[in-house]
């Protein structure tokens, strides 16, 4: 069973809890709903299947606009920088991405993300969450926003992020191209 760390899982739970007007049982399994009543532990592991279903529920009930999903990914950085104080190397985007490489296994217990290419001013990120196409698309947009903001917090300027390939449209893998100036 693939799992996600509580530091990421908590964002989905918070979003669902914030909408008391929605009947989440229409989208989630009984075992998923139990997490809405529990305290999410930052360092605990949670089922990726539940994470995927929660993400799809958010898309269905809150927003299916990928620009909103991208903005949510950007917003995650501020919280993760509090939890992982050494994630950002101020003034050094490359070192920050190197630190992410080290930390990435602490977010998922499988190879969801890879940074195979990293040079000054450019990098590529491979995304493979192994979810259904709609969930994979949303998670990839969230990831794109995450890396945009991570680079900005590290001091990068003129950050550009774009998809080179997308698994949800039939490509073998999703690849994000990152470019920036320092």
PLM feature segments, named:
Residues 1-63:
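N-terminal leader/assembly segments
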Residues 1-13, 17, 105-144, 152-182:
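Short terminal or interdomain "cap/linker" segment that borders an active site or interface and mediates
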Residues 22-34, 98-102, 158-167:
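Short alpha-helical "patches" and their helix-cap loops
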Residues 31-39, 79-80, 166-176:
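Short, mixed-charge aromatic SLiMs
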Residues 39-142, 165:
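Amphipathic interaction/junction segments at domain boundaries or subunit interfaces
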């Amino acid at each position: 069973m693939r799992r996600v760390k509580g530091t990421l899982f908590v964002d989905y739970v918070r979003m669902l809890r914030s909408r008391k007007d929605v009947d989440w049982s229409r989208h989630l399994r009984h075992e998923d709903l139990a997490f809405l009543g529990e305290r999410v532990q930052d360092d605990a592991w949670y089922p990726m299947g539940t994470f995927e279903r929660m993400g799809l529920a958010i898309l269905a009930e809150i927003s299916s606009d990928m620009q909103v999903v991208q903005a949510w990914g950007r917003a995650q950085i501020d919280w993760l920088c509090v939890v992982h104080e050494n994630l950002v190397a101020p003034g050094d985007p490359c070192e920050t991405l190197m630190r992410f490489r080290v930390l990435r296994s602490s977010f998922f217990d499988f190879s969801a993300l890879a940074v195979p290419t990293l040079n000054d001013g450019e990098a590529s990120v491979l995304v493979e969450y192994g979810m259904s196409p709609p969930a994979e698309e949303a998670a990839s947009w969230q990831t794109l926003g995450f890396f945009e903001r991570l680079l900005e917090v590290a001091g990068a300027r003129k950050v550009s992020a774009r998809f080179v390939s997308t698994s949800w449209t039939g490509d073998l893998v999703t690849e994000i191209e990152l470019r920036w100036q320092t």
